[in-house]
Design a protein with these regions (language model features):
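Compact alpha-helical subdomains of small soluble proteins
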Residues: 29, 58-129
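Immediate post-signal-peptide N-terminus of mature secreted/exported proteins
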Residues: 25-56
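Generic detector of short alpha-helix boundary/capping microenvironments
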Residues: 14, 32-33, 104
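C-terminal segment of classical bacterial N-terminal signal peptides
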Residues: 13-24
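Sec-dependent N-terminal signal peptides
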Residues: 5-13
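N-terminal secretory signal peptides that target proteins for export/translocation
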Residues: 1-2
Length: 129
C-alpha cells in the first residue's frame, strides 16, 4: 500500500470526518486493510453527496479523494470494482434520504469526517511497514 496517498487522504479529510455496508471484497484479491479502505470509500461517497447538499462548494473534492485512493492503491478487477461500489453506495444511500441540508445531515458530515480521518490514520499506522 502506498503510504504517501494515505497521508494525503488524512490531510484532505482534515482530522475531523453510516450508511449500510456494501458487499465484501473478493477474498482471493483482498489485502488485510481492504475492509478499512472499503469503509473509507463509502465515507468518501457519502461526503461527496452531503457536502454538496449542504453548500460546501467543494466541487468534486471527495470524488478526487476517491480517485487518489484508487491511484495510490492501484487495485484491478474485482477489488477496484468493490471500492467503487462502496463509494457509489455511500453516495446513493444519502441521495435517497436527504433532499436538503438538515441538522442531521450536518451531524453525519462531522461524524464521517472524524471516522474517515481515523480510518486513514489507523491503516497508515498499521500497514506502513
Amino acid at each position: 500500500m502506498k503510504i504517501r496517498a494515505l497521508v494525503i487522504l488524512i490531510m484532505m479529510v482534515g482530522g475531523v470526518a453510516g450508511g449500510t455496508a456494501a458487499p465484501a471484497v473478493a477474498a482471493e484479491q483482498a489485502a488485510p486493510f481492504d475492509a478499512g479502505l472499503a469503509r473509507l470509500s463509502e465515507i468518501l461517497g457519502s461526503l461527496h453527496y452531503l457536502r454538496g447538499l449542504c453548500g460546501a462548494n467543494e466541487g468534486n473534492k471527495w470524488r478526487a479523494e476517491m480517485q487518489a485512493l484508487l491511484d495510490a492503491e492501484a487495485p484491478s478487477g474485482q477489488r477496484r470494482a468493490q471500492f467503487i461500489a462502496h463509494f457509489n453506495h455511500g453516495y446513493r444511500a444519502y441521495l435517497q434520504t436527504y433532499h436538503s441540508c438538515t441538522p442531521a445531515a450536518g451531524l453525519v458530515i462531522r461524524r464521517y469526517l472524524e471516522e474517515g480521518s481515523k480510518i486513514a490514520r489507523e491503516v497508515t499506522a498499521r500497514y506502513s511497514n
